[in-house]
């Protein structure tokens, strides 16, 4: 069995307290972007969840640098995948003895950064 030279690193953030639709807005924004540019965009993004995405991206960059020895100046965000996690169900009392269910959604985030060759 031949071992391939790995040129990508991953990081994940699980059970983030935000809906997957809102998280995917930020994740889709940084897909196929250089890591340095993505970090700047996430720093100044008005979205609340951008801070969590930035932390996960910084973790992926640290994994690439420390575990694989990749050059951080040539890293590109190749995958930013969002998945649904658990749903916390709550009950809100309403008028006339009724009750309404409130769903609080959680999401998972997976980020992959790859070292691109200079062309």
From Swiss-Prot:
InterPro entries assigned to the protein according to its UniProt record, in alphabetical order: Ribosomal_uL22, Ribosomal_uL22_bac/chlpt-type, Ribosomal_uL22_bac/org-type, Ribosomal_uL22_CS, Ribosomal_uL22_sf
GO CC list: cytosolic large ribosomal subunit
GO biological process, one term: translation
Function field: This protein binds specifically to 23S rRNA; its binding is stimulated by other ribosomal proteins, e.g. L4, L17, and L20. It is important during the early stages of 50S assembly. It makes multiple contacts with different domains of the 23S rRNA in the assembled 50S subunit and ribosome.
NCBIfam families registered for this protein in UniProt: rplV_bact
PANTHER family cross-referenced by the UniProt entry: CHLOROPLAST 50S RIBOSOMAL PROTEIN L22-RELATED, LARGE RIBOSOMAL SUBUNIT PROTEIN UL22M
Family, similarity comment: Belongs to the universal ribosomal protein uL22 family.
Protein name listed in UniProt: Large ribosomal subunit protein uL22
Origin species: Rickettsia conorii (strain ATCC VR-613 / Malish 7)
Gene transcribed to yield this protein: rplV
């Amino acid at each position: 069995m031949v071992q391939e030279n790995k040129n990508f690193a991953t990081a994940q953030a699980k059970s983030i307290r935000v809906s997957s639709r809102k998280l995917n807005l930020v994740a889709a924004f940084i897909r196929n972007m250089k890591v340095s540019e993505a970090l700047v965009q996430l720093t100044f993004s008005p979205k609340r969840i951008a801070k969590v995405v930035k932390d996960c991206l910084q973790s992926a960059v640290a994994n690439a640098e420390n575990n694989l020895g990749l050059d951080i100046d040539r890293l590109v965000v190749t995958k930013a995948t969002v998945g649904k996690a658990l749903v916390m169900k709550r009950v809100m009392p309403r008028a006339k003895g009724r009750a309404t269910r409130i769903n609080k959604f959680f999401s998972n985030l997976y980020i992959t950064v790859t070292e691109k060759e200079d062309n």
